[in-house]
Swiss-Prot record:
Position(s), cross-link Glycyl lysine isopeptide (Lys-Gly) (interchain with G-Cter in SUMO1): K1293
Recorded consequence of changing G1414E: Found in a lung cancer cell line
Phenotype when changing V49L: Found in a lung cancer cell line
Known outcome of mutating T895S: Found in a lung cancer cell line
Modified residues (Phosphoserine): 10, 39, 131, 178, 316, 319, 353, 355, 371, 375, 498, 509, 636, 648, 689, 948, 987, 1119, 1405, 1453
Outcome, altering K661N: Found in a case of clear cell renal carcinoma; somatic mutation
Gene label: PBRM1
Effect of R66G: Found in a colon cancer cell line
Location of Phosphotyrosine modifications: Y134, Y1289
Classification via Gene3D superfamilies: 2.30.30.490, Bromodomain-like
Variant or mutagenesis effect after changing Q1560H: Found in an endometrial cancer cell line
Protein name: Protein polybromo-1
Organism: Homo sapiens (Human)
Binding region for DNA: 1379-1447
UniProt keyword annotations, A-Z: Acetylation, Bromodomain, Chromatin regulator, DNA-binding, Isopeptide bond, Nucleus, Phosphoprotein, Repeat, Transcription, Transcription regulation, Tumor suppressor, Ubl conjugation
Length: 1689
């Protein structure tokens, strides 16, 4: 019998599914023994047990599926059940227990047990034994005790048994088994842990591979006494420390225990620890089962028995498949490959990375993949080269994360593109290639490459070269070729690098760094600067107080002051999980953290100073790192070859950052719920069909629902967030258009619209690429504020704004005011008419204050108005962040002001209301006396009444407190509802009842817009008596607080009503009932199975008014054109007294002029004649004189109005404060603008000024010295309260202003071009024509120059060149520009005067000197200027004569630098004998020594040699000699006997003629040294060529001569011999050598036997080609040995 089954170590195994340890029994096939092995498990974590016990109680359901814990989630409220607190002295509920669990207040299970016992004892003491609460408490307490006992019993292990068990296990493992076999099994177990991923593709073992950093987590080592990680376990595997699987299992248990002890239950690390244990034991059990199954099929040899006890894996499978599968060469030697992979895993874990910080902050990366690519892994291993090449092409993405190969997934449609199949004879797509891969139709990689190339060539043949698909093809071909080369370099049987070894190896890591990795590395460096900063004297870490946020218990005010808390833990987590799109995001969070510290703490405190120091260090380090390098500065991007997931073949679904944002917006709208947990988006998920709701599709022209939005998102149809938001807005607008404004759907649409806007704002807050649209932000804020106020509800779900719908639009006290209601405000908000928050607040407060004025203080409307006004102020302050986001005059009215106004109003109203109540009571008393008198006079029957508590009628008993239906006065009406308060029988024997009457909504007077609860009635002020004979039946009226939770027994739903308010027939008003005072009923109430939802319905009068609304639709459409105007705040002219004012002038602080309100401090555009842009003036004084208005203030000028260097840069929209202060009439004002300081320009905007009219000013321009100097700021004015201040919106993140070049730069360029126009006029046409031709066919810069045959020389015509290379043209133009200067009088004057001024002002810059020279020239007399012009003309004539002589000189005697005297030096590829110096003789058809088609060069160029004078060749001349053909089989080597004639013998040896260097290729040798003809015989001699040997401009140093002494080689051979060695060479080292481990110098590469190969082929270098040859030779050797069974050779 195996060991007893029990729970796993972690108590969370009940949730996470940890395996129990019963599998130990399989490894002991001896006789059965009842042995307890509980001590093998680590100690149970008490915190985890507490969480498990709580979860068990919380999740328990009864037979009906109801959660029993719902009865104990919250203790009864003292207001509802005060008697509960008389019985229970220590109330407690599950919410308090959960809170204590979160705060880790339970150190022991006994503490949790005590609280649960208190909870259930309280329930038993208060509730009756037959109540559901009592029964649930008993059940849950029994469940708790059982579960606790199961967990606590795990500590009953015996240490002695554990030791014996361990010895037994070791004995069974080591007996008959080798250490290598054990090591292989342990590596398999480790591999299962390392490669395990969660469903999203994240590596579970990532944080367990290395221990946490002692710098970042010092408390970890204080809590954990025995730290261990996977690296340590890997080292122990390699060192052979484990003698059994049981020993490794102990370390895995310790690893999981440490993680669960340090981390909170429920955290990701806690769950990962459980998963690692689960994976380990799953793999262990799988190995056991697999080995036992195999052993049962084979003979039980001793070795097999030992293997069974060891539970080792089988490696024999697949051998038969190799013989049958043609592609089996990629799967041969699977055991060896697997062993190599496992060893790579353990070795990678053993050595790890050199940087602990890199490992601590490393996040798992997975290659992007789609569902189709994931499906391939089901039939093909990801290490297969076929799969890697296919997936590289298929998964390649561009910079935006889009799949480049997406158009190639499927073939084009034959219907849409019939011509495609006419042009393309062999169409193919990735889908077909995938099918071939699945069917294993590819024998080699070349076959797969051919199909991919066929697909690409098809696309190139069908599409235009400049099309997007054509460019994609080029990119994919480049990627495919690079991947193919890499796969060819690797050994086919090698599985590739493991994830960790490749991620942590230093070799080649710099080449694989992408821009993303560099960005992350920079963030880690900046983070470590803050983390490791210490105080110089004491060594205190400055970041200690910034690691975690302050405790809410100790610092509750912190979270009221700081609205966005931030700490280093959050920043570190964001870096790890790649939450930052760039470095700026992390810097912003750092700055936010430091800003919070300075905002909360006093200036001068330690935290304040630390924040300042750390921020300074961060800025300095960032400045030191410099800007992030561009893509071009980094190495070429490598293909993603799963380097970081080499041992994790599965790929995760990749989402681009944009897709993640879109998904976040969608999920935020979809998952939003209200306070009651109702998901608002349910109604918007799918539209009703046309058959269900045909009128909807008649009204809505563009239907939209969330399913359609989701399908668009999945199809990648949204390119940005705004396009998705547009569809959401359309959907919500459709809902608001079709549904009534007071309907539930309408309000849900508004709320979800608000959620949508908030989510988009949060997501786009990280982008600083553009200036936010302040107008839209203000309108969005006002919209959110309005929706929040109108949706504000009480505890029962009633909207406070419902009662205010009855407020009249016009105040009777102010009949002249325009009407204003919430409906009018809503239309203004929807039409974006509000541009100021204070105006919107005025309108809202006007409606609410009117409601307060027109209603009593104890009325429901009054109380709702006060509540909405308080809520408005609260939400307004939250949205504006108390002025941090929006600074508005509206913020000056606070809750304190509201309370004062309400108290003052109540003091004024209360005496009047008391008097009204007194008069009302007297009137009611008089009416009651009258009714009693009339009833007494009617008869004496009332004097003989017999009262009772109940009576019977028609076999029914009626009690006092019952609700009954009473026969209506008219037959068509519904029966009345009466609550019986008295029952009696008169002397005549007739039974009567007296009670309060309840009215239905249609029996009250109310507005059609009012909404009511379903089945709602109202308690009236009408009481009367009715004969019992008129009773029609029973019903029940319940108070609103009980109606939704309880239901009466034995009553139908239609006979149950709800009452929330009382109705006064005299005042025709409703008032909410606070205390239910009706008589106690005999009806028994029970809890509802499911609480009723709070649903309000429209009034029955609403349908009647709907027709009137439809009649007014046409009028509203006509008036919609008038709805686009903006509402303006009421302002007034504000005069001001000026002590030093001029007589007759009336001064103002604020003035209305020409439909524009202007105040002191405003900036305006003023008319400026002759300027490109109007100047800007600032109003510092405003006055009116004789009916004309004027203002006075400084003038701002634009950059083009200042004198400055053309190279100076300016901010966009920058202006400068000038020295001018002018008085201007108001008639010259063109419009308002705003001039902001640099700091304000980055951070805020006035809300009423368009962005185009926002200007930046940080400098003052001094006209006298032409200097720009920064100044502190503009003058500020203190204005009266009547002046309306501007509202200022502050950005969440400062913007980055862009600079632009000076406007004078273009003018300066045009001026210079005009000066040189005359000089370059003649040559420009030729050069431009040559440049146009060169753009069509651009010759190669260094073409291969080949020696023509004799027959070809005779046929080569003379073709003069038609184009000039750009490099040559540029050099010629540069040279010519130095010679050709258009001399003018000013240039001559400047050359003479500049030296004089320079001597007078030695400290002046070049620009300042030029400005002074220009001033002197302008001040020069006319006669002097004419004299300079005359002298300049003579100089120009002399230069022209010299230029003409130079142009004629080449025809007679060529000189260096001319086309005739320059030859192109072409360097051929290296030959086995070294670089041969060949001689090239000019031939017919050459232009100055160039073959046809090669352009001449102007001037010396690198690689060219300028020759001396040389006679030109004539087309009719004799054919020159050419080089003899090379020796057969050795291209490029001349025959013997030719070396001493036309070719230098060797590089570095003296050439004939005494020159110490050999002639360069293509350079003519000395006279008389010409090559002989290839065959004997006479030939016509050409004219002699006169040459002047010149020194080459560039001579490469000769290569170093390498000698190999035979004696040295023999000595090395003798030293290598050893008696212990079976071979002469170190063949094992040679066999293990790899290309990436061997680095060759250039000298070593030059000595490689490159002559073995014709060329390097598709390889990058010749060394790579030789490595490939070596691999092929080794493989062939192995194949020959295996094919012929050469085991003993």
């Amino acid at each position: 019998m195996g060991s007893k089954r029990r729970r796993a170590t972690s108590p969370s195994s009940s949730v996470s599914g940890d395996f129990d340890d019963g599998h130990h029994s399989v490894s002991t096939p001896g006789p059965s023994r009842k042995r307890r092995r509980l001590s093998n498990l680590p100690t149970v974590d008490p915190i985890a047990v507490c969480h498990e016990l709580y979860n068990t109680i919380r999740d328990y359901k009864d037979e009906q599926g109801r959660l029993l814990c719902e009865l104990f989630i919250r203790a009864p409220k003292r207001r509802n059940q005060p008697d509960y607190y008389e019985v229970v002295s220590q109330p407690i509920d599950l919410m308090k227990i959960q809170q204590k669990l979160k705060m880790e207040e339970y150190d022991d299970v006994n503490l949790l047990t005590a609280d649960f016992q208190l909870l259930f004892n309280n329930a038993k003491s208060y509730y009756k034994p037959d109540s559901p609460e009592y029964k649930a408490a008993c059940k849950l307490w029994d469940l708790y005790l059982r579960t606790r006992n199961e967990f606590v019993q795990k500590g009953e292990a015996d240490d002695e048994d554990d030791d014996e068990d361990g010895q037994d296990n070791q004995g069974t493992v080591t007996e008959g088994s080798s250490p290598a076999y054990l090591k292989e099994i342990l590596e398999q177990l480790l591999e299962a842990i390392v490669v395990a991923t969660n469903p999203s593709g994240r590596l579970i073992s990532e944080l367990f591979q290395k221990l946490p950093s002692k710098v970042q987590y010092p408390d970890y080592y204080a809590i954990i006494k025995e730290p261990i990680d996977l690296k340590t376990i890997a080292q122990r595997i390699q060192n052979g420390s484990y003698k059994s699987i049981h020993a490794m299992a102990k370390d895995i248990d310790l690893l999981a225990k440490n993680a669960k002890t340090y981390n909170e239950p429920g955290s990701q690390v806690f769950k990962d620890a459980n998963s690692i244990k689960k994976i380990f034991y799953m793999k262990k059990a799988e190995i056991e089962h697999h080995e036992m199954a195999k052993s049962s099929l084979r003979m039980r040899t001793p070795s097999n028995l030992a293997a069974a006890r060891l539970t080792g894996p089988s490696h024999s499978k697949g051998s038969l498949g190799e013989e049958r599968n043609p592609t089996s060469k990629y799967y041969r030697n699977k055991r060896a490959v697997q062993g190599g992979r496992l060893s790579a895993i353990t070795m990678a874990l053993q050595y790890g990375s050199e940087s602990e910080e890199d490992a601590a902050l490393a996040a798992a990366r997975y290659e992007e993949g789609e569902s189709e690519a994931e499906s391939i892994t089901s039939f093909m291993d990801v290490s297969n080269p076929f799969y890697q090449l296919y997936d590289t092409v298929r998964s390649c993405r561009n910079n935006q994360g889009q799949l480049i190969a997406e158009p190639f997934y499927h073939l084009p449609s034959k219907k849409k593109y019939p011509d495609y199949y006419q042009q393309i004879k062999m169409p193919i797509s990735l889908q077909q290639i995938r099918t071939k891969l699945k069917n294993q139709e590819y024998e080699t990689l070349d076959h797969l490459e051919c199909d991919l190339n066929l697909m690409f060539e098809n696309a190139k043949r069908y599409n235009v070269p400049n099309s997007a698909i054509y460019k994609r093809v080029l990119k994919l071909q480049q990627v495919m070729q690079a991947k193919k080369k890499e796969l060819a370099r690797r050994d086919d049987i090698e599985d590739g690098d493991s994830m960790i070894s490749s991620a942590t190896s230093d070799t080649g890591s710099a080449k694989r760094k992408s821009k993303k990795n560099i960005r992350k590395q920079r963030m880690k460096i900046l983070f470590n600067v803050v983390l490791e900063a210490r105080e110089p004297g004491s060594g205190r870490r400055l970041c200690d107080l910034f690691m975690v946020k302050p405790s809410k218990k100790d610092y509750p005010d912190y979270y009221k002051i700081i609205l966005e808390p931030m700490d280093l833990k959050i920043i570190e987590h964001n870096i790890r999980n790649d939450k930052y799109a760039g470095e700026e995001g992390m810097i912003e969070d750092m700055k936010l953290m430091f800003r919070n510290a300075r905002h909360y703490n006093e200036e001068g405190s330690q935290v304040y100073n630390d924040a300042h120091i750390l921020e300074k260090l961060l800025k300095e380090k960032r400045k030191e790192l410099g800007p992030l390098p561009d893509d071009d500065d980094m190495a070429s991007p490598k293909l993603k070859l799963s380097r970081k997931s080499g041992i994790s073949p599965k790929k995760s679904k990749y989402m681009t950052p944009m897709q993640q944002k879109l998904n976040e917006v969608y999920e935020a709208v979809k998952n939003y719920t209200d306070k009651r947990g109702r998901r608002l988006s349910a109604i918007f998920l799918r539209l009703p069909s046309r058959s269900e709701l045909p009128d909807y599709y008649l009204t809505i022209k563009k239907p939209m629902d969330m399913e359609k939005i989701r399908s668009h998102m999945m199809a990648n149809k949204y390119q940005d967030i705004d396009s998705m938001v547009e569809d959401f807005v359309m959907m919500f607008n459709n809902a608001c258009t079709y549904n009534e404004p007071e309907s539930l759907i309408y309000k849900d649409a508004l709320v979800l619209h608000k959620v949508l806007l908030e989510t988009r704002r949060d997501l786009e807050g990280d982008e600083d690429s553009h200036v936010p649209n302040v107008t839209l932000l203000i309108q969005e804020l006002i919209h959110n504020l309005f929706v929040s106020v109108m949706s504000h509800q009480d505890d029962e779900g009633r909207c406070y704004s419902d009662s205010l719908a009855e407020i009249p639009a016009v105040d009777p006290n102010f009949p002249n005011k325009p009407p204003l209601t919430f409906d009018i405000i809503r239309k203004n908000v929807e039409n974006n008419r509000y541009r100021r928050l204070d105006l919107f607040q005025e309108h809202m407060f006007e409606v609410l204050e009117r409601a307060r004025r027109m209603n009593r203080t104890d009325s429901e409307i009054y109380e709702d108005a006060v509540e909405l006004q308080q809520f408005f102020i609260k939400i307004r302050d939250e949205l504006c962040k108390n002025g941090e986001i929006l600074l508005s005059p509206a913020l000056s009215y606070t809750t304190k002001h509201l309370h004062n106004d309400v108290e003052k109003e109540r003091k004024e109203k209360l005496p009047k209301e008391i008097e009204e109540d007194k008069l009302k009571r007297e009137e009611e008393k008089r009416e009651a006396e009258k009714s009693e008198d009339s009833s007494g006079a009617a008869g004496l029957s009332g004097l003989h009444r017999t009262y009772s508590q109940d009576c019977s009628f028609k076999n029914s008993m009626y009690h006092v407190g019952d609700y009954v239906y009473v026969e209506p006065a008219e037959a068509n009406l519904q029966p009345h509802i009466v609550c019986i308060e008295r029952l009696w029988e008169d002397s005549a024997g007739e039974k009567w009842l007296y009670g309060c009457w309840f009215y239905r909504p249609n029996e009250t007077f109310h507005l059609a817009t009012r909404k009511f609860l379903e089945k709602e009635v109202f308690k009236s002020d009408y009481y009367n008596k009715v004969p019992v004979s008129k009773i029609l039946g029973k019903c029940v009226v319940m108070f609103v607080k009980e109606y939704f939770k309880l239901c009466p027994e034995n009553f139908r739903d239609e006979d149950v009503f709800v009452c929330e308010s009382r109705y006064s027939a005299k005042t025709k008003s409703f008032k909410k009932i606070k205390l239910w005072t009706m008589p106690i009923s005999s009806v028994r109430f029970v809890p509802r199975d499911v609480p009723l939802p709070v649903v309000r319905v429209a009034s029955v009068f609403a349908n009647a008014d709907k027709g009137d609304d439809e009649k007014n639709t046409d009028n509203s459409e006509d008036s919609r054109a008038e709805d686009n105007f903006n509402l303006e705040k009421e302002k007034e002219d504000v005069p001001v007294e000026m002590s030093n004012g001029e007589p007759g002038c009336h001064y103002f602080e604020q003035l209305h002029y020409n439909d524009m309100w202007l105040k002191v401090g405003d900036c305006v555009f003023i008319k400026s004649h002759g300027l490109v842009r109007p100047r800007v003036g600032r109003i510092e004084k405003v006055w009116v004189r004789d009916g004309a208005a004027y203002f006075y203030g400084p003038i701002f000028i634009h950059p083009e109005e200042t004198e400055h260097e053309p190279t100076k840069m300016f901010y966009k929209k920058e202006v400068f404060l000038s020295n001018l202060e002018e008085t201007c009439p108001m008639t010259c004002i063109l419009g308002k603008c705003a001039v902001l300081s640099f700091k304000d320009f980055l951070s805020c905007r006035p809300t009423e000024i368009p962005e185009n009219d926002i200007l930046l000013c940080e400098s003052r321009y001094n006209e006298s010295d032409k200097q720009m100097k920064k100044f502190k700021g503009l003058k500020r004015f203190s204005l009266s309260a009547k002046v309306v201040d501007d509202e200022i919106y502050y950005f969440r993140k400062p913007i980055v202003p862009q600079k632009e070049p000076s406007p004078l730069l273009e003018k300066k360029i045009q001026l210079l071009e005009a000066k040189f126009a005359e000089l370059e006029g003649g040559d420009d046409d030729i050069e431009e024509m040559g440049e146009e031709d060169s753009e069509v066919i651009e010759p190669p810069s260094l073409p291969q120059l080949q020696t023509p045959l004799a027959s070809e020389l005779d046929l080569m015509p003379y073709t003069p060149p038609q184009s000039t290379p750009k490099s040559a043209k540029g050099s010629a133009k540069k040279e010519g520009s130095k010679r050709k200067i258009n001399m003018s009088g000013y240039i001559l004057f400047s050359s003479e005067m500049r030296a004089v001024i320079k001597a007078q002002h030695p400290d002046y810059s070049f620009g300042e000197l030029s400005r002074l020279v220009g001033t002197e020239w302008r001040n020069l007399e006319t006669a002097k200027k004419a004299e300079y012009e005359e002298r300049a003309a003579k100089v120009a004539e002399q230069q022209e004569r010299e230029r003409a002589a130079q142009q004629q000189q080449p025809s007679a005697s060529p000189r260096a630098g001319t086309p005739v005297g320059a030859l192109m030096g072409v360097v051929p590829p290296p030959t086995p004998m070294g670089m041969l110096n060949q001689q090239l003789t000019p031939v017919a058809g050459m232009m100055g020594g160039y073959p046809p088609g090669l352009p001449p060069l102007q001037g010396p160029v690198d690689g060219l040699v300028s020759m001396g004078s040389m006679q030109p060749l004539h087309p009719g001349g004799p054919p020159p000699h050419h080089l003899p053909p090379g020796v057969p089989g050795l291209p490029g080597i001349p025959p013997p006997g030719v070396m001493n004639q036309g070719v230098a013998p060797m590089v570095g040896t003296p050439a004939p003629g005494g020159s110490p260097y050999g002639q360069q290729v293509g350079v003519l040798g000395p006279p008389g040294q010409q090559a002989p003809p290839p065959y004997p015989g006479p030939h016509p001699a050409g004219p002699p060529v006169i040459q002047q040997p010149t020194t080459p401009m560039f001579v490469a140093p000769p290569p170093k001569t390498q000698r190999l002494l035979h004696s040295e080689a023999y000595l090395k051979y003798i030293e290598g011999l050893s008696a212990e060695s079976n071979s002469i060479s170190k063949w094992d080292q040679t066999l293990a050598a790899r290309r990436r481990d061997v680095h060759l110098s250039k000298e070593q590469e030059s000595r490689l036997p490159s002559h073995w190969l014709k060329s390097k082929g598709a390889h990058t270098t010749m060394a790579d080609a030789l490595w490939r040859l070596r691999d092929l030779m080794l493989r062939d050797t192995l194949n020959i040995r295996q094919a012929y069974n050469l085991e003993n050779v």
